[in-house]
Amino acid sequence: MVYQKQEPKKKKAIKPYHRIKAHANPASDYNFYYPTGPESYDWTKNYPQQAMNEKKVEIADVGCGYGGLLISLSSLFPERLSVGMELRDKVVQYVEERIDKLREKHVGQFQNISVIRTNAMKYLPNYFEKGQLQKIFFLFPDPHFKKATHKRRIISPTLLSEYAYILAPGAYAYFISDVEELYLWMFEHFKNHPLFEQVERDIAENDSCIPLIVNSTEEGRKVNRIDGKKWFAVFRRITDPSKKDLTFKNYTLTSPKEIDSTTTTTTSTATITEVESK
């Protein structure tokens, strides 16, 4: 009997949606490094070419997924450092490889973005100082449909207070979902928190980040393919709750179809729906 020698199989690169869970349980204990405080984390390993600039991260994509928004932010804000924070190990590995390949292909570019594996629901203040961030994103987070798991949602009164701590006065928080119930949950929590107020409609409509949160992520494009609907909003970090305009008429931005990523306005393709204050 003759045995044929089998060639070793080549290691396949990690691809989006390939045998990777859509979400991870933030309540589970994961064995990974996290800093004891912002001063103890070495950011130079994430941004090697920015080491001498002494810049600080100003933009965070919480639950960054496969890095679609992160890569778009690199071009939109070339002078700012952006970081993606993700819990799933294989997804973080994929984003790291994706950024490395972009840096190799486009010399000198994409040096202002990076990704970290961490549990943002537990350790976000361990990475950022008070008032450090100018923008924070929560794009298509895990809905945690069961009532018993609502405590695992990325938006809650307690977590919003932590986000407010690391956001600078006037900084923006963006969130979007293709699940209306989850969107309304996030909206109500932001609206009712004393340190956040909704951004004025005309400002939100012309925000250059809006087309990105709607269409730059893999999850957003997946919703487009099935002609799904998205609900999103922008809130501002405030410092004085007593000056919050209680007569402000809240609204919701919706996207029934794709927004042109080359434009900075959503009026032609997104519908503005009034949300009555409760």
Curated annotation (Swiss-Prot):
Which pathway is this protein assigned to?
tRNA modification; N(7)-methylguanine-tRNA biosynthesis
One GO BP annotation of this record: RNA (guanine-N7)-methylation
Localisation per UniProt entry: Nucleus
Do you know which CDD domains this protein is assigned to? AdoMet_MTases
Broad class of enzyme this protein falls into: transferase
Annotated Gene Ontology MF terms? Answer: tRNA (guanine(46)-N7)-methyltransferase activity; tRNA binding
Tell me its family: Belongs to the class I-like SAM-binding methyltransferase superfamily. TrmB family.
Against HAMAP family, the record matches this protein to: tRNA_methyltr_TrmB_euk (MF_03055)
- Under which name does UniProt file this protein? tRNA (guanine-N(7)-)-methyltransferase
